[in-house]
Amino acid sequence: MWLICMAALFDMLYCSEVEESMERIFEMLHGACGLETEEMRGVLKRMSDFRTYVLFPLILHDDKLVVSPDMGYKDIEKEERIYVEKIIKKLPSLVWQSMVFLYIPEHDNWILGLMNTVFDTSSSRFSDSVGIYKKSRGRSEMRLVDLMMGMFRNNVSMMEKFGRGLAHKAEVKMKEIPNEISKEEREKQKEVLDKIREYGKSLGTREKQEQILKAQEIVFDTCIYLWRREEDRISFVLKVYLRSLQCKMLGLNKGALADDVNQEVSLLHSISHEILINTHNEYGIEVTAELIKRLFLEYMNIDEEYVSNVVEDVKKKKEEERREEEEEKKRKEEVVQRNVEELLRGEEEEKKGAKAKRKSKKKKKGSKKPEEKESEVEEVSENREAQEMEDSREACSKERNKEQKNESGRCYYKLHKRTLLWREEPEKIKKKWDSGTEERWKGKSIGEIREQKELHDISEISQLLKSQDANNFFICTGEYMKNGIKRWKMVAIAVLETRDWKKLGVVEVGLFKDKDEQNVIFHLMFRPTDLGRAGAVVRSALAKVDNMEKVDDTDDSLDISGFTYPKNTRSEVVRGLNEFRVVWRNPKNTAEVIRSLTVMSRPGGN
């Protein structure tokens, strides 16, 4: 937990105004993490460096995203405009910080002071940033990315001034190093100040200025590209929602810094400009888009090795998509072939029927041979059996239609037996997995099985899935093909609380259609997260992939359209407007709550 808090602290220091005291920040995070001030200072010292930043073109408010990269002022919801204007006024300062900010613990006061002095004393055409954003540019309205890119270009003129001041001040500080300290300590201080001086000089070069602008332009263009894809939009929205809930759980949503935690911390991200530009030049928009998406979703140290992993992941994804397209094409061809064969058989039967009819007219009534009578009886018998089967299906269908009519909007699902297994005792679960075909579950200890049971034994969620308001809670991913079976996922934000812990995360539901075109739930679990892993969990949950190589659709799956739980399963369901809660109680003492799972309504802004 303390690493999570320190990550939040480190980002806040990069984003907060100078007048925000570090003591106030330390005090706030001490309450959330339990770390002492000196411990936090020590971690910060180890984390400090000359990292470079990029800024995401988004505006967040509470638990939702209110302005997207390509959004103009007129498209913003009216009730959000006052808040958005407040953030727009802060954007020039935030853009400036992202371009030149560096945090060196021993020198943070004078560096931050110089940075603000240069910004405050320099003229800017974006002093009325709200007015500029409201204005239309030609026939098209100014988008958020256009506004922010203009701010970056405007701030370039200040970089040389700040760089000169930084280099000069570092030289002055070198001369002020006291002689009383040890030679080793003096060399350390001089080394740090020399790096600051060289960094200041680099800010005045055209090469450095163009690199900053190019990196930011790539981020803006890539965000526009990502925003056109629904799956990526959803991942951004879910990350914002999870981040907001986590801040509330850590107590970081209170006081003057609440907006900074939710707004600025989510927008500023550290990445090497050189790596970003080289990746874009070498691999193009698809790899860059995946890299930028992961940068937003996850706390990752992006280096050359990480980029190589992303490249491989994109290649695998494209190959999987190619296989899916081939499978889908093959499936369609098979359907066409079956239809053609059925049509030909139908035509052949019609010809035979017409021929038999002509022959029967020539014969006198009652002149049929015994063999023909026997054949006719067999045919009638077969037809009657088929008709009875069809009548049975129609009756079942009418009953289901009747139920659908009474409960309009409800969906029907079956629970696969691998999902139902988690309702058993850990010993029985282990025995079943050890003798099964899923390698990843073989050999697990009873302790591991017991831990996984807490996350997987949530079949009561099926009641929410089949309800009329399921879409108010679950986000559905796109369909994908695997081993010739159409699959998809449904994801919802939730909180699972046991007697020992309380965690935020997502409920994952994996589904496929069986041979009868019925929806079957083959995967169901709560996947916990923390502040640093929120994006990773979102990315995993929304990915069009699963680790089930084969799902046997001939297995008996439980139809849950009329499902009720055994009497010895002490659980209750509480439905609210914005949440669905399942409470599991001790069968021997119903006053004792063993677990509770609260599924929250899906976030707005998507």
Curated annotation (Swiss-Prot):
Position of the signal peptide: none
Pfam hit, one: DUF1609
Positions with biased composition (Basic residues): 354-367
Coiled coil: none
Region annotation Disordered: where it falls in the sequence: 317-401
Entry superkingdom: Eukaryota
InterPro entries membership: DUF3654, UPF0329
Compositional bias annotation for Basic and acidic residues: 328-353, 381-401
Family: Belongs to the UPF0329 family.
Name this polypeptide is given: UPF0329 protein ECU06_0090
